[in-house]
């Protein structure tokens, strides 16, 4: 093994290994499956007879501790450690439901014959580049393993019984006089019985697949890989030279024709119809001609395939069960899994990803027959970074979904779902998760007063804004870092135009003249503050009103009159300087009691206050998570929608992670401009959808009918997750016996149960 990943397997045979990731295949509709299948056929046809290659699918068990460490939330020595411990326990119980106990990896090893390493390297590098490009065309992520990574992989396969770390350095070879084999070899090998083998304390068995079926199914390989036990599937494939393959088949056809003539002569001599020939002979002749036609005119090549399955277990009884299960899968598809008696050592060595086949049991197959063993099933999303958040279980594999939105190009997100689909619960669960594992600030716009109990439990601050409240937010607040521009007034003017549109605009919005007047007045009222930026000089809505009154245009008087009720009238809740301290890490703006007239204005003012907070946090290199419930209310008026879209775009650059929560998809897609919210959101958590919304979303997000079924009449907490280019169906069954569930549930039945339990406790006391 060389540091660059080239391995000299024999004196004249050199190989390299590429690791590739999974993509969604089983979830796709038939057209997409066909496209992937055709792409995989083209991939296989790339390999000519001079290149041998091996596909390795390695499912090895990891200890629960390995995964537990990856999902554990570190304790921080504060009053929330009890909640962190509970949340970690919840993640571990969810982990136990899936088969995350297996680490599943996929590799392609390719090799060439060459006289020397120097001669082999250029060829291997060219093939490597072509393979990576072919994977890219399929939408598959792939990377080449270097020497250290290949040795670590081999070490893991040879030490399945002991999770000891791989220790090795290239610098150790020369002084020690050892070879790389000494660093990866297990404590013991045993190949005594002929029908099984031992490696360390594990016992295993190598079998080969006899392909007897006239037609194969693309589920076969997936079913092998879905087994919940340690397993290695190895496919050694070698292309046959096209000219030789055609000559061989033509020769077979000639031989069959000779045999047919002999049979016909025999029939004439015996006095029966010469057309009556053995059925096998007729079948073979037809199949041979069909095969010749495929090779000559259908872009098919001939391959020789050796299909090996290695089962590994702790003891012979468990091994027998695993082998029986694998054999049942083969029989289901009219094939047979046969043990390699007295070839266990050769079989196990052939299963290692070295690209070297010592088993001479081969089956001739065309390109499409080899390609039916599609190496893709379903994509997994399990990111183990310290800020990865729980999103449920993969509905296809039952594995944990853990993602870090900050790793996306655009972390902005949407939570979409009909009432009762689990929309609010999902948002609250994410908020709690963010609070426990990150240091990000969390701000919530709460139009229905749903988030108060959670915020209070997290020692956050609920700012109640209503006509009767004494909590005030000044819509004219301006942070000097409000915009990237030298003049922060540009973006602030946009906000005040949006505010005035909600107040004045009516059906047609603000007229150009009105916009000009408002912009002029805004610049005037901020002049004093910008020259001496002290809090007491911050303008309020009344200053804008007075400035409008001083203008000569009749439009200015019209705008001022429209503003009057919000300045001196009964709706003057926003005509005060801010008196709330919103520096708490978790802040919720409760605007439920603002009423229909003021609610949209309240949401817009909250959005502006959040933007001020984002600009402050940016200076401190701190992220701000913003959750906007009932977001569709901000998207109905043109100017307000335009401002919201602008803020949505700016959030990413300023360290903001906004999440819109809504049931009204139609409003989200009401105009081309608002569609930008979708285009600037790489994270969509989609729960059950109404039929009209499903069709809109299918078109907007290019969702297949099969994928759409996961958001059609789906139960609470079930749906589709869009994370960048990945689409996964998920199921979130959050344990009801946890303290966190009781805090975040909005179901009346759960709340009444809690009340009943509290009453019982009181009686008992």
What are the functions of these language-model segments?
Residues 1-378:
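Extended, folded cores of ATP/NTP-driven motor/assembly subunits in large transport
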Residues 23, 30-49, 56, 60, ...:
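P-loop NTPase motor domains
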Residues 415:
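Hydrophobic anchor at the beta1->P-loop junction of P-loop NTPases
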Residues 423:
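Conserved lysine of the Walker
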Residues 426:
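Hydrophobic positions on the alpha1 helix immediately C-terminal to the Walker A/P-loop
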Residues 433-443:
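Post-Walker A helix-loop "phosphate-sensing" segment adjacent to the P-loop in P-loop NTPases
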Residues 459-463, 673-686:
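A short helix-turn-beta junction within AAA+ P-loop NTPase domains corresponding to the substrate/partner-engaging
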Residues 701-756:
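Conserved P-loop NTPase
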